[in-house]
């Protein structure tokens, strides 16, 4: 694709590379000590009595969040127009209706 514009580029530095190598060498790819450590540190960062759960993707995170707030079939969920398709797809998966709204041209809010 000649004119491809990336949605977002990840910032991957030496620290991130070292952590991935450490995880691979530990034998744990998904669950395990690094995931538990992340969940605990994120909960501590939030500073409230919260529980954090690491998931495999943003789509899974959106699914859990919508389930947690009680979205059910027939509900309407506002989603931004400038987003990844999974934002609206997970709403449909739950039987709800995505309502796509545009963003402010200056602030993108």
Task: Please state what every model-predicted region is.
Residues 67, 71-109:
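PLP-dependent aminotransferase-like
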Residues 1-68, 72, 93-94:
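Conserved PLP-binding active-site segment in aminotransferase class I/II-type PLP enzymes
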């Amino acid at each position: 694709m000649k004119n491809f514009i990336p949605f977002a580029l990840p910032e991957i530095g030496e620290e991130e590379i070292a952590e991935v190598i450490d995880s691979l060498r530990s034998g744990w790819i998904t669950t395990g000590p690094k995931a538990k450590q992340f969940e605990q540190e994120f909960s501590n960062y939030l500073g409230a009595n919260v529980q954090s759960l690491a998931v495999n993707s943003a789509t899974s995170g959106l699914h859990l969040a919508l389930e947690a707030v009680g979205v059910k079939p027939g509900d309407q969920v506002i989603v931004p127009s400038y987003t990844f398709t999974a934002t609206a797809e997970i709403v449909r998966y739950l039987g709800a209706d995505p309502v796509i709204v545009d963003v402010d041209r200056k602030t993108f809010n």
